[in-house]
Amino acid sequence: TKITAKAGDQVTVENNKDFFNYQAGLTFKPVENGSIYISYATSANPVGVDGGDGSEGITAAIQNLKPEEVKTYELGTKWDVLNDKLNLTAAIFRTEKTNTRATAEDGTTQNIGETRVDGIELGVNGNITEKWAVSAGYTYLDSELVDGGYTNVGSTAVPVYQANPSNGNQVQNVAKNSATLWTTYQVLPELTLGAGAVAMDKVYGNATNTKWVPGYVRYDAMARYNVNKNVDLQLNVNNLSDKRYFTKAYSSHYATEAEGRSAVLSVNFKY
């Protein structure tokens, strides 16, 4: 990452960090149509990567810090049922982020923060009958700010740093519950209709959990008509009810607003 101060300051700050990420997993198949797996993966978040959307300030004070490190542990299972037409999945996982940038006891910014997310994922995908297909999923995320560093409870002139009172709060922009449902049905050989919904819990925009955007449910629909074996027409309508909702909150005064009702008509060619 790189920042350049305002005109006249003539200050350029650069950060060049190398990091190595990897993943490993093991799968066991007790029967032909089922499997159980365990996996471990790492990733990294360089300094300043989130600065473009305003969720992270890009300042000279943080440019020499290490990348944030993420570790994910997962245990899950996958099963094919109904003659392999329908796939069922379930997983539990933990994601730990360390080296998070936070204020230290001396008032400087250091890699001392930590967050943790424990989650459950359930999924269904495939065909219930030859004409009826379904895709559904549910996710539960128990997120926590484990260590938010220190906060100044004194003044600028006489700072007094104490452990962050937001420790234990829900992590910003991590919904506790979310679910999706999409289903299609072949009404006629040439005509397929589909409908679905997306549900999301409220999310907080700050560590103190005092600013948030409410949860929402969005409904979508689709119609596809096969003109012949090579051409089909498809109409997708998103946010059928034209609901106003927000997908992300920030610690400042603004949030990310989602699109209103929209429609897309497409022509698909297959050869």
What are these regions (language model features)?
Residues 1-31:
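Signature of Gram-negative outer-membrane beta-barrel scaffolds
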Residues 1, 36, 86-90, 134-136, ...:
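Transmembrane beta-strands of outer-membrane beta-barrel proteins
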Residues 1-10, 48-57, 61, 100-108, ...:
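Outer-membrane beta-barrel translocator domains and adjoining extracellular loop/strand segments
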Residues 29, 35-37, 41, 64-149, ...:
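Membrane-embedded beta-barrel scaffold of Gram-negative outer-membrane proteins
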Residues 198-206, 224-271:
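C-terminal beta-signal and adjacent terminal beta-strands/loops
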Residues 91-96, 111-207, 241, 270:
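Gram-negative outer-membrane beta-barrel transporters
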Residues 18-20, 69-73, 116-120, 175-179, ...:
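Residues that define the transmembrane beta-barrel architecture of outer-membrane proteins
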